[in-house]
Amino acid sequence: MLKNKTIVLAVTGSIAAYKIANLASMLKKLHADVQVLMTQNATNFINPITFETLTGNKCLVDTFDRNFQYSVEHVALAKRADVVLVAPASANVIGKIANGLADDMLTTTVMACRCHKIISPAMNTQMFENPIVQDNLAKLQRFGYEVIQPAHGYLACGDTGAGKMPEPETLLQYILKEVAFPKDLTGKRVLVTAGATRESIDPVRFITNHSSGKMGVAIAKAAMLRGAHTEDVRASMWSTCAMT
């Protein structure tokens, strides 16, 4: 599905960094060329060797690393990239990119890229809701970056709220939407209904069916991946189906 596609994963210093190893493995199984960039702080959460083992490519951390064939690496990689995902994106790196600061391999490469760029913030709720962080994210969106809203849940600091990075399966859908499917439904609005329906007989009894809703969810997801603005209306569903 992703053969001949170069996916750049830019990993910053966040506890959620370990989840990107799973995403890298998923992308590799889809035959993508997966390139991983890390900030120095990110290496405190996960070892670069993990990514090198999963992707078969050198994990780039140091701009001045001389242990590989010479090239202006951040420019060479930027030219090859089909999509860049910065995940988890710390408040620090979001601020750097939004204000044009490029002082390491990750930020210089992101600055040099002309492909689609996706940012997935991950941080404490108070940090995420800080007006400065929100202003930086809004600025990135004006510059054409796609921002994935963080999930709401229990955070590593012990708080519960917005700031949790979405699961790798969700991040994968954003990448696939950008590079793996034709955009023949761009500009279309698709409404899909899914799940078991009920027809009342009287205030107590009703007629229903055993629909799981999985087919409707699959159709909605396929439309979304092909560029449509998709909304799904769900009736009672006998099993849990996730839609991204």
Q: What spans do the regions from the language model cover?
A:
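A cross-family phosphate/adenosyl-ligand binding-site feature
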Residues: 1-118, 124-213, 217-244
